[in-house]
């Protein structure tokens, strides 16, 4: 699945496009408002990015810590959904632990999620967040709850 900056979707490889099953349009979500873009997705790894704009900055001009957390959670959740949706399941963030190492003021924040565990009710992802120079700025450990869909 690939989400372009305008929220449209394309399926990559054998992963399903599940956008039509969401009850809220991408443009109306936090992800769409701030411009998260999924760049690549496989069942074991996914990447995404967001352009640094004033919407993402806190009052000191740095990317807000919550933006890193939200990008990591979106990426880990969407990567999980891409696999479990066809099995009648949905995925939502269960826990998000993010540590910060380096501030970002401009450019992009780029995220890479690597799947560590895929259980029947919980998936776990490690997410690295980097600046345009490839420097590690934050890491997130994401637990994703997998539950039956109610659609």
UniProtKB/Swiss-Prot annotation:
Coiled coil: none annotated. Optimum pH is 4.6-9.6. It is an enzyme of class 3 (hydrolase). SUPFAM superfamilies: Thioesterase/thiol ester dehydrase-isomerase. Substrate binds at residues 100-102. Belongs to the thioesterase PaaI family. It catalyses: 4-hydroxybenzoyl-CoA + H2O = 4-hydroxybenzoate + CoA + H(+). Homotetramer. Disulfide bonds: none annotated. It comes from Arthrobacter sp. GO terms for cellular component: cytosol. One of its GO terms (molecular function) is 1,4-dihydroxy-2-naphthoyl-CoA thioesterase activity. Its EC number is 3.1.2.23. The active site is at residue 73. Pathway: Xenobiotic degradation; 4-chlorobenzoate degradation; 4-hydroxybenzoate from 4-chlorobenzoate: step 3/3. This is 4-hydroxybenzoyl-CoA thioesterase. It comes from the Bacteria. Transmembrane segments: none annotated.
């Amino acid at each position: 699945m690939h989400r372009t900056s305008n929220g449209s979707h394309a399926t990559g490889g054998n992963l399903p496009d599940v956008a039509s099953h969401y009850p809220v349009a991408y443009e109306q979500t936090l992800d769409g408002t701030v411009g998260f873009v999924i760049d690549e997705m496989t069942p074991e790894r996914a990447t995404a990015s967001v352009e640094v704009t004033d919407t993402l900055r806190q009052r000191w001009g740095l990317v807000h810590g919550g933006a890193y957390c939200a990008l990591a959670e979106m990426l880990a959740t969407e990567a999980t959904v891409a696999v479990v949706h066809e099995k009648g399941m949905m995925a939502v963030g269960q826990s998000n632990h993010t540590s910060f190492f380096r501030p970002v003021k401009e450019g992009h924040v780029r995220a890479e999620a690597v799947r560590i565990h895929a259980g029947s009710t919980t998936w776990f992802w490690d997410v690295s967040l980097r600046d345009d120079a490839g420097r590690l700025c934050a890491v997130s450990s994401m637990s994703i709850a997998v539950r039956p869909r109610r659609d």
